[in-house]
């Protein structure tokens, strides 16, 4: 399957399944102490940057002995509140990747999602993002993610580009990111329920197309991974679990 066909299929299936209401996550609870083989673990924590992931990687990721770790991180690293300079971000990402792959887990690194700048700039000072602006900083972060994936021979999925193409990033009610029309919030960063369905579907197709492990998957990241914190509600790990079950 060519990349364009893969992208087109993801968009078509997401639209069809989302409209039909066919994507529902089943009940699930994680228990690393039991030693049970879990299908998908939601290890996303709101507000995390790469420094935070390094502090909790042993307990929240490696303790599950993952067959596959999916890591999406960098949105908080590029913002002023939890800023991590690009060189440090690269170093952190290398260390995280080395620990994960050194444990025997396969690694899938994903780009960070786009955002609606007018909303973002109500929470973060515009001067902080100069000279390249918020979108320019995101491009730079995603370039680092791609380069580290290549350096470590990890899988790489530019899921952010899919959101840019079909996500209607802005103020429309059917945007895949939260806004005033669809959630009564000036968010512009976090996915809507349909956005999480789309993300789960796109990731599941990437995993299956590239024959990555489909058991003991740890989704490791920040609030975009976390969603509602579950694997049976509104999060991409929840929809991923359903699709791979």
Question: Where are the language model's segments positioned?
Answer:
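Conserved donor-binding loops in enzymes that form glycosidic bonds
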Residues: 45, 189, 193, 222
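C-terminal segment of N-terminal export signals and the immediately downstream linker at the start
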Residues: 22-40
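Short, solvent-exposed loop/turn elements at domain surfaces
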Residues: 49-52, 226-228
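Alpha-helical cap/lid subdomain in secreted, periplasmic
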Residues: 33-39, 52-217, 231-245
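A short beta-strand-loop structural module common to alpha/beta enzyme folds
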Residues: 39-49
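N-terminal export signals
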Residues: 5-27
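Active-site metal-binding loops of divalent metal-dependent hydrolases
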Residues: 75, 222-223
């Amino acid at each position: 399957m060519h990349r364009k066909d893969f992208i087109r299929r993801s968009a078509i299936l997401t639209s069809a399944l989302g409209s039909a209401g066919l994507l529902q996550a089943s009940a699930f609870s994680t228990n690393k102490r039991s030693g049970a083989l879990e299908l998908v673990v939601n290890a996303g924590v709101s507000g995390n940057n790469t420094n935070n992931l390094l502090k909790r990687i042993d307990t929240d990721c490696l303790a599950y002995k993952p067959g596959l770790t999916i890591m999406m991180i960098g949105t908080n690293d590029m913002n002023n509140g939890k800023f991590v300079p690009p060189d440090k971000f690269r170093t952190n990402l290398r260390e995280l990747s080395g620990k994960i792959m050194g444990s025997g887990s396969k690694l899938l690194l994903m780009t960070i999602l786009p955002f609606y700048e007018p909303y973002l700039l109500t929470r973060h000072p515009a001067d902080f993002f100069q000279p390249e602006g918020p979108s320019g900083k995101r491009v730079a972060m995603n370039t680092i993610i791609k380069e580290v994936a290549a350096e470590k021979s990890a899988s790489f999925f530019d899921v952010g580009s899919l959101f840019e193409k079909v996500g209607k990033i802005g103020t429309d009610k059917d945007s895949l990111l939260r806004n005033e029309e669809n959630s009564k919030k000036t968010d512009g960063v976090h996915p809507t329920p349909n956005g999480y369905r789309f993300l789960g579907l796109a990731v599941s197709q990437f995993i299956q197309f590239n024959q990555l492990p489909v058991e003991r998957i740890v989704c490791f990241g920040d609030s975009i991974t976390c969603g509602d914190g579950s694997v049976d509600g509104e999060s991409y790990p929840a929809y991923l679990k359903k699709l791979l079950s």
